[in-house]
Amino acid sequence: MTLDRPYSILVTDDDPASRETFRDIFEPVGFRIFLAGSGEEAIDIVHRHDVHLALMDMHLPKLSGLETMAIVRQIKGMLPMILISADQDEGLMRRALSAQAYSVLSKPVSRSLVIYIVRRALEKFY
């Protein structure tokens, strides 16, 4: 997939190092990145910017990744969302997929896998 337009990715994770790692993965391949440290920040960014895909940690302070995803969907509709979790909890994965997450990835995520999944999601939705 060639990035024929500047797709924007919202990365939401309460760990600053994780956010920066995702920035370092996506910016060099041409994505515009917005970073949020909480669900509330993510919702604010979605209100103010054109976001094409959200990459979200499942465990966030106050609003969980799933709760944030539901609110973002009310604002943006069927925005592709990829949830990430350090937990290997099958129930959590099932809930994420039933909430229409595009994919659920386990931390740590390899650079090549996350780029592949993001590109596939963008191809499918846009």
Model-based region annotation:
Residues 91, 109-118:
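C-terminal output helix
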Residues 38, 64-67:
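Acidic catalytic/metal-coordinating carboxylates
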Residues 16-34, 99:
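Two-component/phosphorelay signaling modules centered on CheY-like receiver
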Residues 49-55, 60:
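Active-site beta3 strand of CheY-like receiver
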Residues 67, 88-104:
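Alpha4 helix (beta4-alpha4-beta5 surface) of REC/receiver domains from two-component response regulators
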Residues 44, 66-78:
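Short amphipathic alpha-helix used as the core "switch/output" element in two-component signaling
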Residues 119-126:
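The C-terminal output helix
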